[in-house]
A protein has these predicted regions:
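A beta-strand/beta-hairpin structural motif
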Residues: 309-336, 364
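Beta-strand-rich binding/interaction modules
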Residues: 275-283, 287-302
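Proline/serine/threonine-rich low-complexity linkers at boundaries of modular beta-sandwich domains
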Residues: 246-260
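Short beta-strand segments of immunoglobulin-like
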Residues: 264-271
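Short acidic/polar inter-strand loop motif in beta-rich domains
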Residues: 335-337, 352-360
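Short beta-strand and strand-turn-strand segments in soluble, beta-rich domains
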Residues: 258-261, 302-316
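Short glycine/proline/serine/threonine-rich loop/turn segments at secondary-structure transition edges
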Residues: 335-345
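Surface-facing alpha-helical segments and adjacent helix-coil boundary elements at the starts of domains
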Residues: 1-247, 271-277, 288-291
Length: 367
């Protein structure tokens, strides 16, 4: 696994062992040393989990003792940054939760903020959020005033409802407004990476709470700065693809007087792993220039025989009255790791400002 080897391979694991040994000379670290040599068949997360468990096994003392060792390692001269920090931060979170005290919880939060510039602690913090969201959120909100952009990003990225690779936090899913104060504090942040995290956080929320998201972005757009428009466009991307009328209107896409010709397909049957091409014509039949968000929806066959749609961007354009636009696109059915294709009837339709039309069926052949 070259990708995992590059990020958290044997050299990184040995570097972690060396840094911990320097901080705790009397610790044997036999479990950690052994773990460093058996990473090869494991995924990145499995490697992190193995090294986390090895740290916990080799440093079995209480939370204060464990935290002291990590702080000493962080102050040391040996390398102590990059992906080797992932198992460290998750071990801190495990220890803080297991201690069962407010002091350990608060100190664990502080340590994650201190370490996140070395490697984001967005995955580790989920354990603490899941354990006690009410106690964690005031601390997280305080991070929004940090002078360190990595800490400010941790405040919004670490609390995302659907953070990739991370465990879910039921209390955040149950109360979508719980993290809004963090977003309100950071949507004007000077750092683009922090603002992008705010947008991704809102996009997560839009999956289950579109009305909350469009209300939030409407408030921001009422008093924008030079970056608000871009942030909102990124935050609303899923709602735009779904044709949400309020989201479309916020970005200037209103009900349009247009005619749509097509999509016209270049084949009625597509070999497995092949491509299908299509063309579509759009004409503004109104009397005013019209701004259009033009997408296409590919309805894929599922294993149970039903169809499920996925929206793909075509273009954004403004058409003058009477103006025509011709578009062509090729869609690939090449095998990818994130989607399994099933042979059978598929369908394609064009979506203009959230309104779908021209649904046309074709067949994906078996391998």
């Amino acid at each position: 696994m070259p990708f995992a080897d590059e990020l958290l391979g044997v050299p990184a694991a040995r570097a972690l062992t060396a840094a911990i040994q320097a901080a705790a000379p009397d610790a044997s670290l036999t479990t950690l040393r052994a773990a460093a040599e058996v990473l090869s068949p494991l995924t990145l997360r499995e490697r992190s989990d193995l090294l986390r468990d090895a740290l916990l096994a080799d440093l079995p003392g209480d939370y204060d003792s464990f935290a002291g060792t990590i702080r000493t390692a962080a102050r040391g001269t040996l390398p102590f940054s990059g992906w080797l920090i992932w198992p460290v931060t998750t071990a801190i979170a495990v220890k803080a939760v297991a201690a069962g005290t407010d002091d350990a919880f608060d100190d664990g939060m502080r340590m994650l903020a201190d370490l996140t510039p070395r490697l984001t602690a967005e995955f580790a913090i989920r354990l603490l959020l899941a354990h006690n969201l009410d106690r964690a959120m005031p601390i997280v909100l305080g991070w929004t005033a940090s002078t360190d952009a990595d800490v400010r990003r941790l405040a919004t990225e670490g609390t995302r409802p659907f953070l990739p690779w991370a465990i879910r936090v039921p209390a955040i899913l149950a109360d979508p407004a719980a993290t809004l104060p963090v977003l309100h504090a950071l949507y004007r942040d000077e750092d683009e990476v922090v603002r992008r995290s705010v947008a991704n956080h809102l996009n997560d929320l839009s999956r289950q709470h579109p009305e909350l998201v469009v209300a939030t972005t409407a408030a921001w757009l009422a008093d924008p700065d030079e970056n608000t428009g871009r942030l909102v466009r990124h935050a609303l991307r899923t709602l735009i693809k779904k044709g949400n009328p309020e989201a479309l209107a916020q970005l200037g896409f209103h009900p349009a007087e247009v005619t749509v010709a097509g999509p016209a397909l270049d084949a009625q049957a597509v070999p497995f792993g092949g491509t299908i091409g299509f063309t579509v014509g759009i004409r503004n039949t109104g009397t005013e220039p019209t701004r259009l968000a033009i997408d296409y929806v590919m309805h894929h066959q599922k294993a149970n025989g039903t169809l499920t749609g996925k929206t793909f961007k075509l273009t954004t354009v403004t058409l003058a009255p009477g103006e025509d636009l011709q578009l062509s696109r090729t869609h690939s059915f090449r095998a990818i790791t994130t989607r399994r294709y099933h042979p059978g009837v598929h369908a394609l339709e064009v979506q203009v400002n959230g309104v779908a039309s021209g649904r046309t069926e074709f067949t994906l052949l078996a391998e």
